[in-house]
Amino acid sequence: GVAINALSGGVDSSVVTVLGHRSLGDRLKTVFIDNALMRKGEPERVVKILAKMRIPVQLIDARAEFLGALRGLTDPEEKRHAITHTFYSKVFGRLVRETDATFLLHGTILTDIEETVAGIKRQHNILAQVGIDPEKEYGYKVLEPLQTLRKDGVRKVAKILGLPPEIAKRIPFPGPALATRVVGEVTEDRLEVVREATDIVEKELGKSKAFQYLAVLLNDKATGIRE
């Protein structure tokens, strides 16, 4: 059968993409869905990196659909649900129908499953754990080749596969992307602010040994420190 997977540029989805293409070849169609929520220049950059590895990636412009789904929403869980629904039911569901794909390769890792089951947070990429039958709901089966690995294990696989350090060592980035770093309503203008701030923070702290660093756009003024 034909399989499809969505590349986000993170180490998990990138490893799945390389493994999938080496196993399935032309039977795997890889897409990068630009949801308007990514880092600065990320869609084009990721497509170029995979092209150097001779892996074709189709760039899908779905920015208007995602921004429309998020309009007026301020609750974090409602925003996460809107992104999940738009991704799986609308954009990805449409692509699956167009390609006649019967399988979805997904970069779910062990930590995603544990956090969802424990109720720590709802992971956007966990379907069965949140009561969704993808075959019944969307028409495809989900394959999760990384579900027994944690992030450090995935990074080791990435290095073995020859993925560049900018992907293999990339700091964790949430599935709903910059939408999780905008407090309150997610608009195009507010996304642009946090996108520029994220770019600055990551460039300045990129050589540090910190596990995570990020920028958040608040809804109001916050306490500051003056020299």
Stretches found by the model and what they are:
Residues 1-227:
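ATP/NTP-dependent adenylation/nucleotidyl-transfer catalytic domains that generate, transfer
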